[in-house]
Design a protein with these regions (language model features):
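RNA/tRNA-interacting regions in translation and RNA-turnover enzymes
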Residues: 1-472, 484, 577-578, 680
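A carboxyl-terminal module marker
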Residues: 2-5, 27, 406-408, 415, ...
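Beta-rich nucleic-acid/ligand-interaction surfaces
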Residues: 39-43, 253-254, 418, 422-426, ...
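Short, acidic/hydrophobic/Gly-rich beta-strand patch recurrent on exposed beta strands
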Residues: 62-69, 572, 599, 728-730
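Class II aminoacyl-tRNA synthetase-like tRNA-binding/catalytic domains
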Residues: 69, 86, 92, 102-105, ...
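Short beta-alpha connecting loops at secondary-structure transitions
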Residues: 337-343, 425-426, 461-467, 518-523, ...
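Mixed-charge, low-complexity segments
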Residues: 341, 366-369, 373-374, 573-575, ...
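His/Asp/Glu-rich mid-to-C-terminal helical/loop segments that flank catalytic regions of hydrolases
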Residues: 346-363, 538-542, 547-551, 744-749
């Protein structure tokens, strides 16, 4: 919205410091997007055209004699509307108009001693074609007086950005209220008009379901001419039109915030009916002819009638918005500017708008009518502690009451003797946005200043609202995605299987009393105790279909001999790891450790220990227990060649893991060293029955300083009972770069422990 500081002075005395005014308005939430000075140039004065004569050498030029107070100047003018006895702004010698400095000049052989100016030449919006005609609306016209000494020609135009909930500030009066409250300066109200009705020509009838509030003044029509101060105000707001009646209505709406309209009446009396039209929108009918749709569309103004019926209207903005939304698919005749004002909340004090308009029309009021409608007060009660809790700032009761009263709120103490005291606040009817205690707190904060709030960290305690079942589901879904990323394909099988096949492969079976009493078929006569049987069948089917590289994954239920359900993960690979493709012309076969590495990418790091008991499906020398977090969680093995031959499979490996023993890893942060590490490779002569896991555990338990890791490198037979085991010791510090002496010390301590615990020695 645009308005000038001169407009604001109609209702409130604004501060002289315009920059401070803009800053304070922005603090109040009325963001000033631009502030443009509109000041007439120096040496531009009020002049009066005494005579006008045609130029002897140019048809479109006139030679005027202009009185500028101290003297009469001859000025050549090209405007068509220049005329004798006309007051106009005159630029004297030395005045700067745009980029031109006015000086004595000769135009087509005639001397000119100045320039009669238009509004645009002076830096103001366009008012009309030709020169600007001055009138007494801007002040008493004194010949020779500087134009910038008149308030309308020495002002600033503010462009204010409003939030949608502040419809009360879509008027000069609304902004003036805010300034009055902030600077504690009195607001100049719109004067009420005292009049005696002189006719009874209007018969007003409104249907019972009408929500709008309407008020009317009947006046005599007379010749209208828009004064210059109104033209300037409307031009600043891009609302000036050629229709004088429309200018008065737009000006009064712009200033008062009341939605105004006028109807021309050629005959009286009239039947004035307010009812819903075919679209269920409230409309005005005069003598049974539709004349307007309230808050949506007004008829074009014509001021040729004998009488004028002035109308002020108000409709609840929420009700209007709901009606428009319900009709969004219909094509309606509507005025977007009118809807914009109405849907954001116009001024419901209708008499303000009618009185303001009637005063500027200088009209005699013949009659007034209004619908029976009253606005309900919006009352809120709260304690001071409520405001303190919302804002985080303790504010004195007197200050809160003062702010609210300055804004037009009615404030009272509901229960004077109660502790703490309860304040009762009635919001003014033009503040449609005040509905809750939070809105009251926001009003107080606007005037206290958000910069005065003490910055505090947010005290937020978030409880863990996790669902353990969902967490488990997500955990195994992630494992499945990892398996898919490693090339495994997910399969699903029945929980039923053949008891004989399970026994043949060495898996446990259900105890006889717990067996199925009525199996589906003889091939599905028991509950499965392992996922591997089904994976073997799936591998065979894929082999028969021509696939040479098979990697399968399954998660499902199995049962122990007691028929207790257990969730397990099964992995099986068969055939080639890499298909026949360069650089592997014959493909690349799987090996035990490659398969183990793939499984570890899915379930995490683990270690292996030798199986103590073997079953027919396992290869006796390539099978192991899977150890994770010091617990046996499953088995990994190559499938015995005899089983491969009997089932007609490719060379295969499997792993089966108890899902209940897999732990969701916690996110742990570990420090890392910025210093270089040192490695020492050792070849140890050691008993062939010594497991590497025991060697690693012994060195870890010894807590040798700076020894961070020990890795197996190679193994080969040394003698009948001994092997040569190559290991790598990784040595580094978090605090410094180690020297050779410190590195050798760590290695020596490791050798001493290995010699003591395992009778190991360095190979000579």
């Amino acid at each position: 919205m645009k308005l000038s500081v001169n407009d604001l002075n109609v209702f409130v005395n604004t501060p002289k410091d315009i920059a401070k005014l803009c800053e304070d308005l922005s603090r109040l939430g009325l963001e000033v997007e631009s502030c443009i000075p509109c000041i007439a140039p120096k040496n531009v004065v009020v002049g009066k055209v005494l005579e006008k004569a045609p130029h002897k050498n140019a048809e479109k030029l006139s030679v005027c004699q202009v009185d500028v107070g101290k003297e009469v100047l001859q000025i050549v003018c090209g405007a068509k509307n220049v005329a004798p006895n006309q007051f106009a702004p005159v630029a004297l010698k030395g005045a700067i108009i745009g980029s031109t400095t006015i000086a004595k000049t000769e135009l087509r052989g005639v001397e000119s001693h100045g320039m009669i100016c238009s509004s645009t030449e002076l830096g103001f919006p366009k008012i009309n074609d030709g020169i600007l005609e001055l009138d007494e609306s801007v002040g008493e016209l004194v010949l020779g007086k500087g134009l910038n000494e008149y308030a309308p020609f020495n002002t600033h135009v503010l462009e204010i950005s409003l939030t949608p909930n502040r419809g009360d500030c879509l008027s000069v009066l609304g902004i003036a209220r805010e300034i009055s409250a902030f600077y504690h300066t009195p607001l100049k109200p719109i004067k009420a008009l005292n009049f005696t009705p002189k006719s009874d020509s209007i018969a007003l009838h409104a249907d019972e379901n009408i929500e709008s509030h309407l008020a009317y003044y009947l006046i005599y029509n007379h010749s209208l001419k828009t004064p210059l101060n109104i033209k300037l105000s409307l031009a600043h707001n891009n609302a000036l039109s050629e229709n004088d009646l429309n200018n008065f209505i737009e000006f009064s709406t712009h200033f008062s915030g009341v939605i105004l309209n006028a109807y021309g009446l050629n005959t009286t009396p009239v039947d004035l009916i307010i009812k819903n039209d075919e679209n269920n929108l409230e409309s005005v009918y005069i003598n049974h002819q539709k004349r307007s749709t309230i808050a949506i569309k007004h008829q074009d103004q014509k001021d040729l009638s004998e009488h004028l019926l002035l109308e002020a209207s108000y409709i609840d903005p929420i009700s209007l918005s709901l009606k428009l939304h319900a009709l969004k698919d219909k094509t309606l005749q509507k005025d977007n500017a009118l809807i914009y004002r109405s849907a954001r909340g116009s001024n419901p004090n209708l008499s303000d708008g009618l009185n303001f308009l009637s005063t500027h029309l200088k009209a005699t009021i013949l009659e007034s009518k209004q619908t029976k409608h009253s606005l309900k007060d919006r009352t809120l009660t709260f304690q001071l502690e409520d405001i303190t809790e919302i804002l985080g700032l303790a504010i004195e009761e007197e200050k809160i009451q003062g702010i609210l009263k300055n804004l037009g709120f009615k404030v009272s103490i509901k229960e004077p003797n109660s502790k703490p005291q309860i304040l009762e606040v009635v919001a003014p009817n033009f503040r449609h946005d005040i509905k809750t205690i939070q809105d009251i707190a926001e009003e107080i904060l606007r005037f206290v200043g958000i910069d005065n709030l003490i910055s505090k960290p947010l005290n937020c305690v978030s409880s863990k609202n996790s669902n353990p079942h969902y967490d488990t589901h997500r955990f195994f879904e992630n494992l499945k995605h990892k398996a898919l990323a490693c090339g495994f394909k997910e399969v699903i099988h029945y929980v039923f299987y053949s008891k004989e096949k399970q026994q043949k492969l060495g898996f446990e079976v259900l105890e006889d009393p717990l067996e199925l009493q009525n199996p589906i078929t003889t091939e599905l006569n028991t509950l499965r105790t392992s996922l591997i049987c089904g994976l073997l069948d799936a591998s065979l089917r894929n082999k028969n279909l021509g696939f040479k590289s098979i990697a399968l994954y399954e998660k499902g239920s199995v049962y122990n001999s007691k028929r207790e359900e257990i969730q397990k993960l099964g992995f099986l690979i068969s055939g080639l790891q890499k298909k026949e493709s360069y650089p592997y012309a014959k493909g690349k076969a799987w090996d035990f450790y490659s398969f183990a590495e793939c499984v570890s990418k899915v379930i995490g790091d683990f270690s292996l220990e030798k199986l103590t008991t073997q079953i027919p499906i396992n290869h006796p020398y390539q099978s192991a227990k899977i150890i994770q977090n010091h617990e046996v969680i499953g088995v990994i093995a190559k499938i015995h060649p005899k089983v491969i031959q009997e089932l007609d499979l490719f060379e295969s490996y499997y792993a089966e893991i108890d899902a209940s023993k897999l732990k969701r890893p916690a996110m742990l942060l570990k420090p890392f060293s910025i210093y270089p590490s040192s490695v020492r490779d050792l070849t140890l002569i050691i008993d062939e029955n010594t497991a590497f896991s025991k060697i690693k555990k012994a060195l870890k338990d010894a807590q040798i300083p700076n020894l961070s890791e020990i890795l197996p490198l190679d193994i080969f037979k040394e003698s009948d009972n001994t092997i040569a085991l190559s290991v790598r010791c990784v040595i580094h510090s978090l605090e410094k770069t180690l020297n050779d002496e410190e590195v050798n010390s760590a290695v020596q301590k490791a050798l001493e422990i290995l010699e003591k615990e395992f009778n190991a020695r360095l190979k000579g």
